[in-house]
Amino acid sequence: MGLFASKLFSNLFGNKEMRILMVGLDGAGKTTVLYKLKLGEVITTIPTIGFNVETVQYKNISFTVWDVGGQDRIRSLWRHYYRNTEGVIFVVDSNDRSRIGEAREVMQRMLNEDELRNAAWLVFANKQDLPEAMSAAEITEKLGLHSIRNRPWFIQATCATSGEGLYEGLEWLSNSLKNST
């Protein structure tokens, strides 16, 4: 009985750990998002070759976030990070209209991956501070998000440098993951 009560208490009040994979095309702002969430500040970044992994605490959830480089030549390595992923944060450069089709193709391939079939999908429509940025509604259309079935998804307009929208996205993700367990 003591073990049952302990597990119940932990589930109700304790920290829950979630494995999150953050991906997107190169230059979308993934690393800036990660360190804005982790440190609360903008750091100077260089293109990620490989990955960064950090734990981000939000409310009573401890997100282990894997930020994986987005260059074309290393995207084939992403599949090595899929196992046990509970949520995907797909970061899109809202200002890069020339690559939104490429982002859609990459995302659609990932949606077809069996190991990600139960993952919640959060799309960060990043760089909303730029004057020519596509709105979240426009990105929803261009990525074909309305065609996603049998899994939760959400799009959040963000600006990684100011932090705008990041915690709203984490709020949705934490609620989505809580509801799926």
Swiss-Prot record:
GTP binds at residues 25-32, 48, 70, 126-129, 160-161. Its EC number is 3.6.5.2. SMART domains: ARF, RAB, SAR. One of its GO terms (biological process) is regulation of fatty acid metabolic process. It holds the Pfam family Arf. One of its GO terms (cellular component) is Golgi apparatus. A lipid is attached at G2 (N-myristoyl glycine). It is found in: Golgi apparatus. Disruption phenotype: Increases phosphatidylserine levels in the outer leaflet of the cell membrane. Simultaneous knockout of DRS2 results in inviability. Present with 19300 molecules/cell in log phase SD medium. Belongs to the small GTPase superfamily. Arf family. PANTHER family: ADP RIBOSYLATION FACTOR-RELATED. GTP-binding protein involved in Golgi vesicle trafficking. May modulate vesicle budding and uncoating within the Golgi apparatus. May recruit the lipid transfer protein VPS13 to Golgi membranes. Recruits polyadenylate-binding protein PAB1 to COPI vesicles, and this is required for correct localization of the asymmetrically distributed ASH1 mRNA. Interacts with RUD3. Interacts with VPS13 (via C-terminal part); the interaction is direct. This is ADP-ribosylation factor 1. It comes from Saccharomyces cerevisiae (strain ATCC 204508 / S288c). The gene is ARF1.
